[in-house]
């Protein structure tokens, strides 16, 4: 399916687009048990302490301050997809994992960016929205200087 056939457009997360991100995630109860795409932005103890409402507020604060990155997909004017990206310093949770810390990554292969989450509205899945959103996020990363992009695939069929 072609992007044009889906009438998709993309906008980076910002204070202007926060209400669209919020609408998409509120429709799905914060996604993944109220994560609000915060899990990789903080320590797991902080994530647990915040709870769903606190995570919502935490991500909103980061977005309004320009410290959260991601790409929102729109079908017409409706937000239908999301791809979170950021630097390793921002998406720091991966680096804290035991397995990751044991990796011997050569300096030239160290990531400049990470992609942590992809989400598509449950009523619009299986139409290719996620792949187009991923491509839009990669284009935005390139626009911001590019470099090595690290991603961690995870299948969450019940989301």
Q: Could you tell me what each predicted segment is?
A:
Residues 1-42:
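Conserved N-terminal entry element of GNAT/NAT acetyltransferase domains
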Residues 21, 68-83:
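Conserved beta-hairpin
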Residues 22-30, 83-94, 139-141:
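Short, solvent-exposed beta-strand-terminating loops
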Residues 46-72, 88-94, 114:
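A short helix-loop-beta-strand connector motif used in the catalytic cores of GNAT acetyltransferases and
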Residues 61, 78-125, 159:
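Conserved acyl-donor/pantetheine-binding loop and adjacent beta-alpha core of acyl/acetyltransferases
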Residues 115, 149-151:
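Conserved hydrophobic beta-strand within the GNAT/NAT acetyltransferase core sheet
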Residues 115-120, 126-142:
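Conserved acetyl-CoA-binding loop-helix of GNAT-fold acetyltransferases
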Residues 142-147, 155-159:
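Conserved active-site alpha-helix within GNAT-family acetyltransferase domains
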